[in-house]
Amino acid sequence: MKSDIEIARSCAMKRIEDVAATAGIPADVLEHYGKYMAKVPLSLIDEDRVASNRLILVSSISPTRAGIGKTTVSIGLSMALNRIGKRSVLALREPSLGPCFGMKGGAAGGGYAQVVPMEKINLHFTGDFHAITSAHNMIAALLDNYIYQHRSEGFTLKQVLWKRVLDVNDRSLRNIVTGLGNTTDGLPAQSGFDITPASEIMAALCLADSEADLRRRIENMVLGISFDDKPFTVRDLGVAGAITVLLMDAIKPNLVQTLEGTPALVHGGPFANIAHGCNSLVATKIAMSLSDYAVTEAGFGADLGAEKFLDIKCRKGEIHPRVTVLVTTLRGLKMHGGLVGGEPHEQERQALVEGFANLDRHVRNMQRFGQPVVVTLNKYGDDTEEEIALLSEHCKMLGVGFAENNVFAKGGEGAEDLARLIVETIDRQGAKRIRMAYADDDTIEEKVNKIARNIYGARSVILKKSAEKKLVRIHAWGMDRFPVCIAKTQFSFSEDPKQVGAAKDFDITIRDFVINGGAEMIVAIAGDIMRMPGLPKIPQAEKIDIVRGQIEGLA
């Protein structure tokens, strides 16, 4: 089979104004980035259409390092809905350069279920990540300058919380010292870098519903702590307007297309393990305004991305998915059942059955939120009919719908059965309100405990002393009502990536809380998770090259 990039190049793209026309977007509102990409205005949001849309959330079992294929299935499903006569628009996150050149590779789908132009989307796209990186680091520079220029007046901060960001995987930047050299080179300070998808500006942009809301959120971002234990914010720095100006274009969603011409809004890119893992609220609302069945994705497994989509994004945006689709693979289930590789067939079968426990917990979790659930198998060429039948029968026992899909090889045609099942499920179940995992007025400790115990299956939550100190501050600053975003490994329900399947008898250790006053969430750091990833021994960058003017090896 052709590579992803070869498939993408072999399919003729429509001009972006033609894609816009299929979604009912007037050509004169498009801001073109070449022939095949454009930004669209927030004025396209129609709250009445949003309220009536049959939003479909795509999530998955806990992923393996080989991936599960949520983005590919999301793209294929939206194309399939259009193929069966429904009106569908897709909303996805933007890829990050860090994983693209690191371990994961690109994030524009795969096979015959891709968004295009895939090279541009996977690389610099329309510059949103650059704008977010620039805005975040501009705040860091302005804060350092403020401290430097006002030191003669006795001004200083007890603690600076604001780090810098960069859209690369670079472990050597996690902890740095700035301001070395002469006295004119700034004041020495211990700091560090996070990856751009973990930036609070990324989160705020993805949760803001307007430019004014984004400016308000930027004003409230906490940069440091004064000696009287008060928050020092961007408002105190007096630069919220300047930072918002840097993001004026970045807040507008990007319109592209799938290989079959389905309109796709690709906008924002927080990771689900270290951030809230959803594309922008405005992109989702525009997709809902332009269609009857909007399809969107939440990152990693349902314990991370879907929980945060429902508890954070839906709480803020007052949107309600009509169904959650859980993507799985036989290979992934076997790995959750303890399969290492090379075992005899009978051991593979047993591993598959034992791996069902991971799927079961994700199904129960989504049902806990009041979500109707459909399970879809992302098919591989070596899947056997016997094993597929086992999974189908197991889903029947769980009382949830099941459909295979083969969108990687067949595009939208490979998900038509899945699309019909989803439409039937939505029609049968009707609209249901989300049952959130916690209430707004729960304390931060209660929110963390409810997620850890009820969603992850943890025995208890252990708070490190540093986390306990942060909680005192959160209480004192009146931020208890913020939702909680737990940063945790994506490979396990626990904080240990090696505990696959449905982990039991484990505790969740919270070692720190990050106060996101602008994004209006409290990030709880669980276990050893890092907000600046490192590169693997053999990064994807070694496979990428340019040959006779064409990019090769990007996947």
Residue ranges of predicted features:
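Flexible phosphate-sensing "switch/lid" loops adjacent to ATP/NTP-binding sites
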Residues: 1-555
